[in-house]
Each structure stands twice: as structure tokens, then as C-alpha cells.
């Protein structure tokens, strides 16, 4: 077999936030098995740097959230992108991998592909859900998309855009049968007690819209099940302060166990979870925690979203199952009464409710197996295959 890479390859990877840094580090580790002397360049966070990557700028420079933030930092982001493209065209890496951050990375990939550099986009944007026309630009910009979820690959296949389903790294990190006793010990909780986890979201806007209905639902649930205790993991000090201010107004008397992070352990310890939509819903599914998904947003945002979003479901467990596996209470349906009513079904000790719970957890386990594929290794294999492929 002809060896394409006599020299160790130069592999460019750009991560724009913490989740991308984690994926990048896992990918580098897996690639080093095949290419122990490869050079890794691009934009890296601390985990990728620890694996030996070189970075053009601090990854934090790219980590901006929300439209207002992006607009404010746009000149700087555009400057970094120009600088990155210039450096890549000088360095001529053997392959460029943009991890997530599609609004930043896809334009870079397009420019590099036009200049003969192989490109991969790692983590599919939600083109299957909204702004579906983006798929044509992705097709122009990339040689391959790496997708976490099987329905994403099915969408790309419809448009004949090269895509490989690699499974989800989170499914690799969480045991098929999570250990509740261990989670309780980690959180210093009494495992004989009953808990419900409440995740109000990681963004300020989510806490603003969801803290009140979630807290009111907890109050109603406490009346029905006085023995239930509530675990509230908060992503950072800023969100914790924001949540505590709302709680002081809405439910000052309600006892809660506030946690700094540790959402995964909280969901494993809990009998049920109340959460905002997003990756947290997938994590709850992998933790085998029966959940209720609640979401509210600005009326104008919701008006637009209803017209733009093309999927029947909003939460990843339901999208994966292609059925309403867990309740989704969105906008005007996201009331304390509705949330509490759906959560109460998971807490009932009646035989029929316990059987439904068992069936749901079995479905969660089947879906977990579906996306547990050793994603780091699968991603590395896809990169290697493209690297070793001779130019046509």
C-alpha cells in the first residue's frame, strides 16, 4: 500500500468553546495513536493545549454567546478569522477540522477548500431543524461532516452531502446503567431520600424565563409529595446569583439543595428531572432520568422559531426516538401546573406508573446504545481515511 504521508501530517483544528475543546482533545489523543509525531495547530483551549496543540489566539476570544454579544465583538471575530485563514494558507495543513462554531468555522472551511486543503466540519449544525438552506454552503465548504446523531446523517444523505455518524461522546462518558449510590455519595446525599433535579439552563435568558415556572412547579410538587427534595445544579456563580434573586421573590420558603455544577450526578441521583431543552435533555436520557422538558422565550423569538423550526419535536430524546417519549411543555404550555402534573406521574408509586417508568428507562437505554460508538475513535478514523485518500 502506498504511504501518502511520509512526513508526519500537520492537522489544523479550531475549537470555539469549552465543548469543542473537549472534543478536540479527545480527537487529538485518538489521532496520536496513528500519527504520534503529527503537528496540531489552530485555535485551542486548555485541554487541546495539554495534548500538544499550538494555538493562534486564546480560545476564549471566540467564546461569545447571543446575538448582542456577537454583534459587539464582530470586528474582533472577523479579524481573527482573517488572521486564521491567512495563517492556514501559509502553513498549508494536510487537513482542517472545524469543531462546531459553524458561523465562524464554515467560512474558514470554504476558503481553505477552495485553496485545495481538505476540510471536515465536526458537529453538525442544526440544519435539520432550521435554516435548512445552510446545507448547500456546508456542502461547498467541507469534504465531510461528522455527526453525533443518526437522524443528522439521514438528513445529509437526503442532500447527498458526505457525512459520517460517529456516535456521541457523552454516550461514551456515561455508563449504560448509572450508579445512583455513587452519585449520592459524590453529592453528600442520603440515598434513602427521594430527589427531583431542576435544571434551569446555562444562559441568563433561560434562567430569567424558566426559574419562576420551575420553582412554582416545585412548590406544587412539594404539596403532593412532602418527602421530595430538590437538587438545583447551577453552572456558575453568575447563574446561581441570578437564580437566588428570583427564588427570593417567587419561593422564599421552598427548601432547595443548590449545587455548583454537578448536573450529571444530580440527574443520576434524582427520580425525575425538570429541565430546559438542549443538550441537558440528552444528558438526562443517558443518565436514565425520566424528564419533563419546559421552555419559554420572548414572544417574538417564539413567533419566529415556530415558523423556522422544521421538526415535530424540540428535545433530543424525542428526536432520537422519533416519538413523544418525554413531555415537552413549550411557551404558554410551560406553566407550573402542567410541569408539576407531568413530573408527578414519574413520582407515583402506583403499579402502572412504575411499569411506565421501567419501560421509559429501557427506551433510554436502547437509545444510549444506539449512539455509544466510541466517538473519539470514530472521528479519528474518519480524519485518517480522508488524510490517506489520494486527491482525485
Curated annotation (Swiss-Prot):
One of its GO terms (biological process) is lipid A biosynthetic process. This is Lipid-A-disaccharide synthase. It comes from Pasteurella multocida (strain Pm70). It catalyses: a lipid X + a UDP-2-N,3-O-bis[(3R)-3-hydroxyacyl]-alpha-D-glucosamine = a lipid A disaccharide + UDP + H(+). Its EC number is 2.4.1.182. GO terms for cellular component: membrane. InterPro entries: Glyco_trans_19. Belongs to the LpxB family. GO terms for molecular function: lipid-A-disaccharide synthase activity; phospholipid binding. It comes from the Bacteria. Condensation of UDP-2,3-diacylglucosamine and 2,3-diacylglucosamine-1-phosphate to form lipid A disaccharide, a precursor of lipid A, a phosphorylated glycolipid that anchors the lipopolysaccharide to the outer membrane of the cell. The keyword Lipid metabolism applies. Keywords: Glycosyltransferase, Lipid A biosynthesis, Lipid biosynthesis, Lipid metabolism, Transferase. PANTHER family: LIPID-A-DISACCHARIDE SYNTHASE, LIPID-A-DISACCHARIDE SYNTHASE, MITOCHONDRIAL-RELATED. The lineage of its organism: Bacteria, Pseudomonadati, Pseudomonadota, Gammaproteobacteria, Pasteurellales. It is an enzyme of class 2 (transferase). Pathway: Bacterial outer membrane biogenesis; LPS lipid A biosynthesis. It holds the Pfam family LpxB.
Amino acid at each position: 500500500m502506498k504511504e501518502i504521508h511520509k512526513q508526519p501530517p500537520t492537522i489544523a483544528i479550531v475549537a470555539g468553546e469549552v465543548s469543542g475543546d473537549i472534543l478536540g482533545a479527545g480527537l487529538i489523543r485518538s489521532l496520536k495513536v496513528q500519527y504520534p509525531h503529527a503537528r496540531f495547530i489552530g485555535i485551542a483551549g486548555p485541554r487541546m493545549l495539554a495534548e500538544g496543540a499550538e494555538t493562534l489566539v486564546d480560545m476564549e476570544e471566540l467564546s461569545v454567546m447571543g446575538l448582542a454579544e456577537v454583534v459587539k465583538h464582530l470586528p474582533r471575530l472577523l479579524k481573527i478569522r482573517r488572521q486564521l485563514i491567512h495563517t492556514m494558507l501559509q502553513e498549508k495543513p494536510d487537513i482542517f477540522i472545524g469543531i462546531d462554531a459553524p458561523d465562524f468555522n464554515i467560512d474558514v472551511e470554504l476558503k481553505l477548500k477552495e485553496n485545495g486543503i481538505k476540510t471536515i466540519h465536526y458537529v453538525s449544525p442544526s440544519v435539520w431543524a432550521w435554516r435548512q438552506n445552510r446545507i448547500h454552503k456546508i456542502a461547498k465548504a467541507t469534504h465531510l461532516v461528522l455527526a453525533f446523531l443518526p437522524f443528522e446523517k439521514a438528513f445529509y444523505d437526503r442532500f447527498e452531502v458526505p457525512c459520517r455518524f460517529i456516535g456521541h461522546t457523552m454516550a461514551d462518558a456515561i455508563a449504560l446503567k448509572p450508579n445512583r449510590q455513587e452519585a449520592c455519595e459524590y453529592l453528600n446525599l442520603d440515598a434513602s431520600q427521594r430527589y427531583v433535579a431542576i435544571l434551569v439552563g446555562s444562559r441568563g435568558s433561560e434562567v430569567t424565563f424558566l426559574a419562576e415556572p420551575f420553582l412554582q412547579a416545585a412548590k406544587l410538587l412539594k404539596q403532593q409529595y412532602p418527602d421530595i427534595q430538590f437538587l438545583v445544579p447551577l453552572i456558575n456563580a453568575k447563574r446561581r446569583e441570578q437564580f437566588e434573586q428570583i427564588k427570593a421573590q417567587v419561593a422564599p420558603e421552598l427548601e432547595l439543595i443548590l449545587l455548583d455544577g454537578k448536573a450529571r450526578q444530580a440527574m443520576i441521583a434524582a427520580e425525575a428531572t425538570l429541565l430546559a431543552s438542549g443538550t441537558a435533555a440528552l444528558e438526562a436520557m443517558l443518565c436514565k432520568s425520566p424528564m419533563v422538558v419546559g421552555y419559554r422565550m420572548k414572544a417574538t423569538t417564539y413567533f419566529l422559531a415556530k415558523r423556522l423550526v422544521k421538526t415535530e419535536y424540540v428535545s433530543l430524546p424525542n428526536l432520537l426516538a422519533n416519538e413523544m417519549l418525554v413531555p415537552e411543555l413549550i411557551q404558554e404550555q410551560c406553566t407550573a401546573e402542567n410541569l408539576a402534573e407531568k413530573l408527578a406521574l414519574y413520582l407515583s408509586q402506583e403499579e402502572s406508573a412504575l411499569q411506565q417508568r421501567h419501560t421509559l428507562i429501557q427506551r433510554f437505554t436502547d437509545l444510549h446504545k444506539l449512539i455509544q460508538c466510541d466517538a473519539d475513535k470514530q472521528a479519528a478514523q474518519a480524519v485518517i481515511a480522508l488524510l490517506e485518500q489520494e486527491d482525485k
